[in-house]
Amino acid sequence: MKERYDFKEIEEKWQARWAAQDLYAVPDYSDRPKYYCLEMFPYPSGKLHMGHVRNYSIGDVVARFKTMQGYHVLHPMGWDAFGLPAENAAIKHGGVHPAEWTLDNIESMRAQLKQLGISYDWNREVATCHPGYYRWTQWLFLQLFHNGLAYKKKAAVNWCPGCATVLANEQVKDGGCERCKAPVEKRELEQWFFKITDYAERLLKDLELLEGWPEKVKIMQENWIGRSEGAEIDFKVEGSDDIITVYTTRPDTVFGVTYMVLAPEHPLVEKLIAGSKQEAEIKEFIRKVRNLREIDRTSTEAEKVGMPTGAHCINPLTGEKVPVLIANYVLMEYGTGCVMGVPAHDQRDFEFARKYGYPIRVVIQPPGVELDPAAMEAAYEEEGFLVNSGPFSGMPNKEAIRAITRHLEEKGRGRFRVTYRLRDWLISRQRYWGAPIPIIYCDRCGTVPVPESDLPVLLPMDVEFKPTGQSPLAECPEFVNAACPSCGGPGKRETDTMDTFMCSSWYYYRYTSPRDNDAPWDRNKVDYWLPVDQYIGGVEHAILHLLYSRFFTKVLYDLKLVSNLEPFSNLLTQGMVLKDGAKMSKSRGNVVSPEDIVARYGADTARLFILFAAPPERDLEWSDQGVEGCYRFLNRVWRLVMPLAGLLKEAPAAVSGKLVGANREMRRVTHSTIKKVTEDISARFNFNTAVSAIMELVNALYQFREIPESDRNPAVLREAVESLLLLLAPFAPHITEELWEATGHRGSIHLQPWPSYDPEAIAEDEITIVVQINGRVRERLLVPAGITPQEMQDRVMKEPRVMRMVEGKKVAKVITVPGKLVNIVIK
């Protein structure tokens, strides 16, 4: 018998055996119900951090649990290997090529994951930087292109000077780059976009299908999509045929418009100011505004600055001339790039009008109150009745919204419109380490897609990839110069690469047939495995990866390439791992290395602590004492089971006969624990309380072990120890394999059936009921478990202490809650 828990020897032994047996390889099909468990794949930085350990440990418990429950489980892993982090890291580390850097990091991180004992099917591993993968990323781009969902246009884009590339709107956080934090600028560039806006309504509506998603994530996506209903209203420019079309959710206030504001980027501005006295001054104002960050223009705290153009437009309902201005707070990207100023009923407009002296005209009055524009200290933005609004005066403003919109439609001066905050997905990147966009430009034929037979368009290795603001591929003539696929003449390849989120928007399909050279996936396999049953990752991906993946799935569904409407049925967003109350980071000096913890305590201890310390969706505070405690617990399990190994091998496999005393209680605790752990994992993912219940079972087993062997039923002991190991196996896979083998079992514990509880075993002989007198607790009594309400009353009324308390009093009534309490009401 091995007296000492040697985690290093045990973990190396079982990791080697699992690999030799290919234990976690998953056949493509099975008669068992399928279960696809997936954690978000990582960027290969080279080092796992504790957030990774938490993410993958959670997924591994789910995968192992479902396997033991009889499911056919797909649990793959791969690498989100393209993108700026790898390129920037390669530049930082002395010009090492991103490919070499990335592949070395993959080797390192794969080894670390295997050290943790995660049950991945490594036969299905993918890396997005491999030509066999990005060939199909390019193929998917072509499907969007051929179906009008990929297009190129000149646009004002988010430019990160730190990363020297364009960012999608979703990659800008508080006016800065989400990766390097540099202030984001606006630039006009020719860029490729995907028409995600074509799917805005479906992306919004189908959130209802995602019953297994956290509400907070659905709300984040709903807000990002930003659906609003309103009206487009046409204001004719005075003395011109030009029209200023404004979008508003408040057409009920159009009679209160006293000025019109255009974004400096609005296409009409140049025409409106041409030849005016202040043209040069306005152009200088526009130049300054365009250099401002978006957040500085839209912040509620930022000063609102405007300039009159000298032009006027005509209110389509009143015929009144309205001055046209430009201002820093209006953006071309939102609505139609213009805002009608209604200072009486919009606080921002109110402040702007007061600052520049524009009239304030009340057109909505609150019930029973008359607003005086001169006395107003703030805009009135609540509901009320229209005034000063022609034929609509007296109408409730909610009703007027519809009535005025209909009137504008009848007159041909406006229309009902639904708009979205969501903008098309910008996928062009002016960096090297990404999938090349499969497009060739020909002077004769224009924009020509690369034929599918010519894929992949390989990323050349001999390229100067340091950021200059230009696409590095543009400096590689061997890549750039290519024959036009249409006419055979000279052509130029697109030199931008694709946003890495393109690669991660479909990887969960590729896992189903990762070595298929003829298609991105086998349709039969995708239809069998998809959607993903359980997806696990950080909430920070709510409006990036998760939204893009939903968009891709809907496009693929429309193209009849998949059968699932949504990619992920259930989503778990785990919390962060904190130390000293803050997120772990090198700058704070509070990083805990998973490698150090595994070397000192073992992978099973690291996993157990991560799973025990907090519910998965909550932030977890790192605790060295907590790690020590989990290590001591595993040592307790070892010291409990190993001395019993010989006895357990000889014990009967099944419990028989009537049990009493300690044997009955031990079996009750065993089956109660099975019930508790099963429910905690399957219904709630409450791994922390599941581990706590297992710890209580160990305590009970230690007590049971101390009773004389002659009084101890060996079958009860065997059942309890086997149950302990089976319940603990998903959390601590190595030690449980070793103890399972030591106690005489053949075959991996991870392929055993999950234990089921016996309802009769957990039924208690006696229960405790509460006795109240006039609602105050006076006594607690042990009574038989199957006692009837009448028997409860009879038992309580015969209790000596109760009899003394009610003696000489009138019992008004007796209230009985079956199995719980008896309340005697006396006067």
UniProtKB/Swiss-Prot annotation:
It catalyses: tRNA(Leu) + L-leucine + ATP = L-leucyl-tRNA(Leu) + AMP + diphosphate. InterPro entries: aa-tRNA-synth_I_CS (IPR001412), aa-tRNA-synth_Ia (IPR002300), Leu-tRNA-ligase (IPR002302), Leu_tRNA-synth_edit (IPR025709), M/V/L/I-tRNA-synth_anticd-bd (IPR013155), Methionyl/Leucyl_tRNA_Synth (IPR015413), Rossmann-like_a/b/a_fold (IPR014729), tRNAsynth_Ia_anticodon-bd (IPR009080). Pfam families: Anticodon_1, tRNA-synt_1, tRNA-synt_1_2, tRNA-synt_1g. It is found in: Cytoplasm. ATP binds at residue 586. Gene3D superfamilies: 3.10.20.590, HUPs, Isoleucyl-tRNA Synthetase, Domain 1. PROSITE patterns: AA_TRNA_LIGASE_I. GO terms for cellular component: cytosol. A motif ('HIGH' region) lies at residues 42-52. Keywords: Aminoacyl-tRNA synthetase, ATP-binding, Cytoplasm, Ligase, Nucleotide-binding, Protein biosynthesis. One of its GO terms (molecular function) is aminoacyl-tRNA deacylase activity. One of its GO terms (biological process) is leucyl-tRNA aminoacylation. Its main location: cytoplasm. It is an enzyme of class 6 (ligase). A motif ('KMSKS' region) lies at residues 583-587. The keyword Cell membrane does not apply. This is Leucine--tRNA ligase. It comes from Pelotomaculum thermopropionicum (strain DSM 13744 / JCM 10971 / SI).
